[in-house]
Amino acid sequence: MCGIVGYIGTRPAAPMLIKGLHQLEYRGYDSAGIALNHENNQPFIIYKEKGKVSNLETAVINDQPAATVGIGHTRWATHGEPSTTNAHPHLSMSGEIVIVHNGIIENYKELKEQLERKGYIFKSQTDTEVLCNLIDYVYQRNGRQLMAAVSRALYHAIGAYAIVVMECKDSSHVVCARKASPLVIGVSEDNTEYFIGSDATPMVEYTKRVVYLDDGQIADVRRGEDINLINLSDHSAADVNVKEINLDIAALSKGGYPHYMIKEIFDQPRCMRDCMRGRIVRVRDYSGNGEHYEVHLSALKNFKAKLIRARHVIIVACGTSWHAGLIGKHLIEQMCRIRVEVEYASEFRYSNPVVEKDDVVIAISQSGETADTLAAIQLAKEKGALVFGIVNGVGSSIARETDTGIYIHVGPEIGVASTKAFTGQVTVLAMLALALGNALGTITEEEYQQTCHELTVIPDKINQILEQNDRIKELSAMFADRHNALYLGRGFNYPVALEGALKLKEISYIHAEGYPAAEMKHGPLALVDEHMPIVFVATHQGQYQKIISNMQEVQSRKGRILAIVSEGDSVAGRICEHVIEIPHTLNALVPLLSVIPMQMLAYHVAVAKGLNVDMPRNLAKSVTVE
């Protein structure tokens, strides 16, 4: 998502900050800015630009500002559109406090209303400006002590944050804090320089000594002094643990992983939380005695009535996004009782499709630039349909061309083979189905609450699967010298079988086919022999007994079976050569778990074959030609 940099030292801060922002560009962003504190009790020098860091750099170089303390930020919009006004850093109304922030303040609307009643005026649409003025409000009423003001303000803020704050009266320090969003402080040998970042990438050139802030910690970082580190929960002093790192910049951008793909696979729990943050919220009951879940999707604000009236939804997408669309079909049909078709965008645009003015077309794309999907959107608009976009690329062509939509907010996906974008797309489709089903009354309140809760714990269950990485690496050996493979599933897991097969063929160059398990006997069974690896998705949810029968058919023909099964399964293990267990969840959400071993398996097969995992031959990340 966004990126934070900070510098406290003896060198000119502006070029240090710009260089740091360049090194965080891989995280993705739509605008950038820096704030400089050049002299006590003097106004901050602030530069903000929409678009690339290079735009910001031009403005800064032309001015050559003098300051040795500053903070910087690359923003990826979550509250408020991409614009210079909404870009960070944000200045308080008094002009005395400036802040950069990663994360989402979930109760920012309530805080904003409270501050407006106290006379505060806001310039942007962001939750960050609200937090900045909340700190300012406390600061002005508590002796203008920055550390105390930040601590007290954060007590009232609900959500996730990594923040760095400066005060204009003291140009020798910054205050930073974190909760559920990373923040790192680099330390020079003599404490004359400190470097701050969302990760260690911006500082590794200057120091190998870093302090990783833990959740719920706040730090006062002052030039020439030791870091003052406090636990927010009880205001007790915390130990400052300086660690030595020994990584180059390229390795750090991959988080220490050997490839972007495996990093992105392991990023998925965090990415899912980012995707749901501020969208699935726990709200106190009117009685005040309990809490319940609500799905808040700003994309529905002006279009809910038309979405509810729709009796026909068409999902258009390509590749992995098409597989997510197939899962979306199941979700929307089951929760909303609306008829859904899923079309390849490349076929839809040339088929003279039947689209009525009350229909809804959902366009799904990771990049937001897929040429065939853009053409399908144009056709749908010409026919009068409401077009709803689900994309990762903020400010992308699809985001601009659709009537409304939802960003998946999983951060930039570098590996060509999509992983975290897929789970982000399915998560958004689940939230959309929940919101519409609740509005339509086609799911019960119990189902709504149960599904919301289960979505929020899926990231923890993905972590359990990721712990099996070493074992899945061992299992990949059964594929490394094969030329063909079958992937089979039923119901919600049929699209997962398609996705698993696509992942294997994309990066390992092994021909693989995904099929509905019941259709195996209508052709693919002829391919089964003692050399053919077959992957079954055989979880307890759905048509379990049926797929066990399908597995027995393969076993009787000496096929080599690897099955993805529910935790504690005692039946499949007697039929299969190998099993991978995944935690239990609701049938509708199983794909978010069952796809994870598929991704890991494909990765390890490709690595074992010595292939370029992140850049497979003949493929591009964003398909911008038809």
Regions found by a protein language model. Give the residues of each.
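Conserved short alpha-helical segments that host acidic/polar catalytic motifs at enzyme active sites
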Residues: M1-P258, K263, D267-H312, Y350, ...
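Structural beta-sheet core signal
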Residues: I4, I99, V165, C176, ...
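Glycine-rich oxoanion-binding loops at beta->alpha junctions
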Residues: T68-T85, V283-A305, G328-I364, T370, ...
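Catalytic-loop motifs flanking and including active-site residues across diverse enzymes
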Residues: D127-V130, A324, G328, G424-L429, ...
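Active-site phosphate/pyrophosphate-binding segments
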Residues: Y155, Q268-M272, M276-I314, T404-P533, ...
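Generic C-terminus detector
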Residues: M261, R560, G573-I575, T585-E626
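Glycine-rich phosphate-binding loops that contact phosphosugars or nucleotide phosphates
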Residues: I308-Q450, E454-V457, T539-H578, I582, ...
